[in-house]
């Protein structure tokens, strides 16, 4: 997407005009204009010159945004500051003249303020002073007239047109009344001129312009706050970097840093580029990028990111990504691109905005004509028409969606949740199914030791010492898990001899003359005797989805160490939160059914789909899409097709660049709880957009009839043009202020979650409990039943056991496949005999 800065837009009618003009350019496939940021995003093959020409011909200005988002944004911010300063000066000058005008026009009549003696009874002089003061206010605010009438001549009237027409009509009519009064005074004296004083609307013209300027200032200030999150990100990047050249430290501008440069970072400094630590260790605060408040330890080989803060030690790093390629720049670009797109919900407002101003002008003319036909004076009829013009506000409609999108995206960026488009921000909250890839998403993606079970007569330390010696020379992933666990528990590797790795089976080596063996249950069973109690333990571990590793020395079993790709601590909570939102959670994995169900049970998902090959995930997602709107969460290369196929693709931040490119939402952390947080933020943003649109529509729906005088005969309600201008000024301010409430949304708090979908098992297979019937001898009474029941239900995979001593049976319901030997052992340990 190519982005452009657009100048001269003042309301939704302007943005609609620009969008319509650019969309007609050959080669443009999509165009989205953002009134909030005065920017435009264009996709297609059209050249920049053709696009800029189309905008210029529509009466506005356009320029290509800078290549670096940080510089472009800073330039845009400077333009906004200058515009705000100019607006402030205009307002102060307008207020000075308005106060004097109100003193002469209303102060004497309403509050009895004294007038200079030469003005007492001199109505013509009073009118002339009001004309001059009003003219001064009009000159100060001439931009409304230049923009408004230029747009009218081009056939694309905007909000400035409404203001210009309203103020001009009030000024023109009052000027005509002044000339008529002068003529009457010349021919009939002061008494003949007196009635014309009530026909002056000079103060209305000046008040309209001043109040609209007040509203524009409030709106500009509030709009500035909507981009605070993006501005804070841009300010994170350091302006200077310390590079090592010729063994010396040199300070250079950060933008001159090149890939491969060695740079130093002292405690308290920001890291200037993405890179890798080559010397030193420290704790780095990465909260700016990930939202994670706890510092992350860094040492040689660790990755570091630009704009994160080195907190303690001295680091030397090699730059790998600089300038616009850093993670920070990509985040800024992503947030900026998302703000340049439009949400589907904005389409209605866009359609209305395109015809809003011409319709309002038509209503104003009809209003004037109707009141004249009803016998009212020209002044009264004109006042009603002016009220219609100045109360109507297309800005509120135009801002309703983009302000909420901007604030929502900013909130997401603060919390490490990046929505690539406005569509993804709107649609994420509507998903009814979330499919989670198991490895790296629900689980940590790397094996870890979960159980250490020494054999009888063997100490825990003895088992770990032998396992450490044997696994130290293995390159298997499970060996790394065992070594890490041994290191944490004080077991150091010892030098072995005659080390042999038998593919698919196990390991063998000699340590101090003793023969060590390690490997699968089957491999060790063939080499040494395995006691029944340890065999039962290995069956239990396998049933829980773990991999038991057995170790023996000189033919004697030392014990079992189990390893598994353990689930992340926050995964069950994340799944629970999603289910509490009414979202069905499905786990996809290539693992076998038994392992998959064990992990699924720990995570608490609704459904497990096991045995899914990498290229089969996309087909599963296609099938699930028939049952509802689906989000796919993954991190690997083989997840990319599924992420693309899903309605919303969510990439875990620790994943690959390919997965991130294919996704609609990127989670900078690897926390699964960020998925419900993204849904929560999306729902809050969509709710805010609906509130804004409701306010904008209801304001105009009620305000225009009130201004036209529809309720005068029914309730006696009418609206002075000055109050109409005040209402118009506040309408946009209210919409922007409402959007700012999104800053207070607690995206990680489930306190206010509610279900918008009902989780139904209608479309997916039930997780039916397996049932096993055991025949047992030796049970004589209810106490026997209770003992057997308690023993069976103590097993983790047993849901319930119905035991009958009269029938001599136990009906066992299982949540996962469980070896019969495990059930049998549990019963026979209580001195009963299982016969079938």
Q: Residues of each region from the PLM?
A:
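Conserved ATP-binding TGD loop and adjacent catalytic N/P-domain core of P-type ATPases
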Residues: 16, 267, 431, 511-513, ...
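Juxtamembrane coupling segments of multi-pass membrane pumps/enzymes
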Residues: 71, 75, 181-185, 190-193, ...
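Conserved catalytic phosphorylation-site environment of P-type ATPases
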Residues: 289, 348, 383, 396-470, ...
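ATP-driven catalytic headpiece of P-type ATPases
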Residues: 89, 308, 429-475, 505-586, ...
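Conserved cytosolic catalytic loops of P-type ATPases
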Residues: 26-49, 199-200, 231-325, 422-467, ...
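Transmembrane helix-loop-helix hairpins at the membrane interface
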Residues: 85-240, 351, 716-721, 727
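Flexible metal-binding regulatory segments at protein termini and peripheral loops
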Residues: 1-127, 150, 232, 248-249, ...
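Membrane-embedded alpha-helical bundles of multi-pass transporters
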Residues: 110-124, 153, 172, 411, ...
